[in-house]
Design a protein with these regions (language model features):
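Extracytoplasmic gate region of multi-pass secondary transporters
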Residues: 26-27, 208-252, 256-262
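Helix-breaking motifs and short loop linkers at transmembrane-helix boundaries and internal kinks
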Residues: 38, 70, 91-96, 241, ...
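Conserved MFS/SLC helix-loop-helix module at the cytosolic interface between two early adjacent transmembrane helices
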Residues: 57-96
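Cytoplasmic helix-loop-helix junction between adjacent transmembrane helices
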Residues: 101-139
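Helix-loop-helix hairpin linking two adjacent transmembrane segments in secondary transporters
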Residues: 133-186
Length: 389
């Protein structure tokens, strides 16, 4: 009965993951803004990186401030900023308001990432259910990432390419609904010392070997995600001479497989020990990358790209859950640290570019394999001693 009540209370929290996926409209919308205002390729290319930038600068400070604000209030703040960001272009559509809107969407998303995951632990106290719920959250976010751009295209279809921002009333209404639902749901506030925390207090947690390894684990799983998405289309073009239209199919296979894998993981992690699931998936991921490197067949390579997405899909949630369970009394700071590591994952892309430029496309796959090998070390080398809150 208690678990049933927890799951009902968790629904508005899980719905917040749908809002989290809205930031992915930045990529598709920036193309239309560029045409309207004549932005350079450099300026337009900078826009999507705003999501990573705010993770880097806000992860730890927001994690520290959550001790004062409370997790639920911090989530509500993130949604308020997101709504303001969506209103700006509707009030005044120009280059400046679009840049400010993108910044607010990035800030809101970063704050939401830091606060929503630990808020889930307020209502889901069972460790196996927590990992499964975090995975379910990633599924919901993935669905949102697919739906968001479609809403942009819907607005363009009805109102024209210069009115792409008419998608914001729909996305803003969904965000407002999410905020009202969460506000109306009673969630017991987490216990907090109320002490003022500094950046050094949070970074000191990395002296704990387990937390350090898990921090790097987040870094590298984001690296695997970014790397596979980045390299998949390039690999198909280089190896098989696929056209621009054809290569778009490779990332789609990856994202679809990742979504299916996360959905399956949400069910299996309730029944299977998370470490066992982690280990099996990492071994399968290594095998997929080795086949990708050694076999030159377009169908086999597409299957391998999808397999990497499938087998790596639940790893973020598993590592995040392990970190929260290792030091639950420091959950807010842990969340800030882990989200900061998400920003660091963007470093992997330049490394892949360097590897491709030096030794060819296989060098890029090898960088991805190195990331997976580290995660395999985490799967077999970390022993989390779960402590009580």
């Amino acid at each position: 009965m208690k678990n049933k009540h927890s799951l009902i209370t968790a629904l508005p929290v899980l719905f917040g993951f749908f809002v989290m996926g809205f930031c992915d409209i930045v990529g598709i919308s920036s193309d239309y803004v560029q045409r309207t205002f004549g932005w350079s390729d450099v300026m337009t290319g900078f826009v999507p990186s705003m999501v990573f930038i705010w993770f880097l600068f806000l992860g730890i400070p927001v994690g520290n401030q959550m001790n004062k604000w409370g997790r639920k209030n911090t989530v509500l703040l993130s949604m308020a900023l997101t709504i303001v960001g969506m209103l700006l272009p509707l009030i005044a559509y120009n280059s400046a308001t679009c840049m400010i809107a993108y910044a607010l969407l990035g800030i809101g998303n970063a704050i939401l990432q830091v606060s929503l995951n630990p808020l889930l632990s307020n209502v889901i106290t069972n460790s196996s259910l927590l990992t499964s719920s975090l995975t379910a959250g990633q599924v919901i976010k993935a669905i949102s990432s697919l739906v968001g751009p479609e809403i942009v295209l819907l607005a363009i279809g009805y109102f024209g390419a210069d009115k792409w921002y008419y998608c914001f009333p729909i996305l803003g209404a969904i965000t407002l609904l999410s905020a009202i639902w969460l506000l109306a749901t009673p969630i017991e506030r987490e216990k907090s010392s109320g002490a003022t925390l500094s950046m050094s207090n949070t970074f000191a947690l990395l002296k704990d070997r387990t937390i350090l390894l898990l921090f790097l684990g987040i870094f590298f799983i984001v690296g695997v995600d970014v790397a596979t998405n980045f390299i998949s289309s390039k690999l198909m073009a280089v190896r098989f001479g696929w056209s621009d239209e054809q290569v778009k199919f490779a990332p789609q296979v990856y994202f679809l497989s990742r979504t299916i894998g996360a959905l399956l993981g949400a069910f299996l992690l309730v029944r299977i020990a998370e470490m066992k699931y982690f280990r099996v998936n990492m071994i399968a991921c290594i095998a997929s990358l080795l086949v990708l490197m050694l076999v030159e067949n377009d169908i086999v390579n597409l299957i391998c790209i999808g397999a990497v997405g499938f087998f790596a899909s639940s790893v973020f949630a598993i590592i995040y859950s392990m970190a929260l369970q290792a030091r639950p009394e420091k959950a807010n700071q842990i969340s800030g640290l882990m989200i900061t590591a998400v920003a660091g994952g963007g470093v992997v892309t330049p490394a892949i570019g360097l590897a491709i430029g030096t030794v060819g496309i296989l060098g890029g796959v090898a960088v991805t394999l190195l990331c997976v090998l580290y995660l395999t070390y985490c799967a077999f080398g970390i022993k989390v001693v779960k402590t009580q809150k």
